[in-house]
């Protein structure tokens, strides 16, 4: 068993994990987000749904961030090589290419990582174990096996860019959504979690 899976197997919540911000600096412990509702997505700047999903992520963070939502984006190049920029190039790609028009994410973006295979970030290994399939499409799989570039391949692998994981204020993953489920349509589920009470830091 690889180290990422060992760490994931021992974890009880996302608070056991950390990730380095895209802008650089020290790793951010997800434990610092205790009490917040988290929406975690693997993102890519050259995907067919980049404009839709990035703008919807911004919209959810803008509207629901003050009430306790934190959106987290993890660039990943494992799906069709659609995040082939270097870490330091991603923000400019978003600003000038796609979505373009001066777009700037208002949510946390982290350094590129893998979400599947032996090199998967421990956070994603944990999320995949906790939520083995998207709730809206339990049969979601990679549509073209020729595009699989990682090993081992597991049934709970993320199938493409912009899969979403909703995590409650206790750090426990609650629901997984496929790439086809629009980010903005998660709002009712987020609202339900936020209405359960104020977030506590």
From Swiss-Prot:
Modified residues (N6-succinyllysine): 86, 112, 146
SUPFAM superfamilies: Thioredoxin-like
Site positions (Subject to oxidation and hydroselenide loss to dehydroalanine): 47
PROSITE patterns linked: GLUTATHIONE_PEROXID_1 (PS00460), GLUTATHIONE_PEROXID_2 (PS00763), GLUTATHIONE_PEROXID_3 (PS51355)
Residue ranges of the TM segments: none
UniProt EC number: 1.11.1.9, 1.11.1.12
Catalytic activity: 2 glutathione + H2O2 = glutathione disulfide + 2 H2O; a hydroperoxy polyunsaturated fatty acid + 2 glutathione = a hydroxy polyunsaturated fatty acid + glutathione disulfide + H2O; tert-butyl hydroperoxide + 2 glutathione = tert-butanol + glutathione disulfide + H2O; cumene hydroperoxide + 2 glutathione = 2-phenylpropan-2-ol + glutathione disulfide + H2O
GO biological process: arachidonate metabolic process; glutathione metabolic process; hydrogen peroxide catabolic process; lipoxygenase pathway; response to hydrogen peroxide; response to selenium ion
Compartmental location: Cytoplasm; Mitochondrion
GO cellular component: cytosol; mitochondrion
Subunit structure comment from the entry: Homotetramer. Interacts with MIEN1.
Function (record text): Catalyzes the reduction of hydroperoxides in a glutathione-dependent manner thus regulating cellular redox homeostasis. Can reduce small soluble hydroperoxides such as H2O2, cumene hydroperoxide and tert-butyl hydroperoxide, as well as several fatty acid-derived hydroperoxides. In platelets catalyzes the reduction of 12-hydroperoxyeicosatetraenoic acid, the primary product of the arachidonate 12-lipoxygenase pathway.
Family from the record: Belongs to the glutathione peroxidase family.
Protein's name in the database: Glutathione peroxidase 1
Lineage: Eukaryota, Metazoa, Chordata, Craniata, Vertebrata
